[in-house]
């Protein structure tokens, strides 16, 4: 497996997509920390809004789904992580569990097959990567002390992003991991 980096620019974001596809083609796996990509809450230099790491995770997920490992039948091996200080951390934590809920509805109410290669799972997102939150000692200390955890902007670490009770955030990590 290869650990890859990505810079916060569209050229690098798309280069990562190409690089992952080629690595999958030749039978390898990849892992990428997406904490370098600014939050959807931040601003672009031209005044617009970025789409955030989750939007590009959708693209990377589809590449992993379509380019099988070694161009055979085995699924691509893929990991994505986000640091616990990232402003989009809650959306990252919850994204796969939300998609799993959709799959359950499709299976239970729509009559779709429950196997992983069936239509229910092929129609939802975030199924082709293991997602990991990169926690810090500071975060774990905030959990133990029952403190609020503040995120920070990617582009300006001095600027505070959203905050949550640290224990609640850790609880969501456990609940969402269990739900998948």
Task: Outline where the language-model segments fall.
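Active-site cavity-forming subdomains of large catalytic enzyme subunits
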Residues: 2-180
């Amino acid at each position: 497996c290869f650990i890859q980096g990505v810079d916060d620019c569209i050229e690098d974001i798309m280069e990562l997509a190409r690089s992952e596809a080629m690595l999958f083609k030749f039978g390898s796996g990849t892992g990428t920390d997406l904490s370098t990509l600014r939050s959807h809450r931040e601003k672009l230099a031209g005044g617009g809004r970025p789409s955030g790491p989750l939007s590009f995770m959708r693209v990377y997920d589809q590449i992993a789904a379509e380019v099988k490992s070694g161009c055979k039948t085995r699924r691509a091996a893929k990991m994505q992580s986000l640091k616990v200080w990232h402003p989009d951390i809650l959306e990252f934590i919850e994204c796969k569990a939300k998609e799993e809920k959709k799959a359950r509805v499709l299976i239970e109410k729509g009559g779709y097959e429950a196997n992983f290669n069936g239509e229910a799972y092929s129609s939802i997102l975030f199924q082709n990567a293991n997602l990991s939150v990169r926690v810090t000692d500071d975060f774990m200390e905030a959990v133990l002390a029952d403190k609020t955890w503040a995120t920070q902007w990617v582009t300006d670490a001095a600027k505070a992003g959203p905050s949550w009770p640290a224990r609640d955030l850790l609880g969501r990590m456990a609940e969402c991991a269990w739900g998948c």
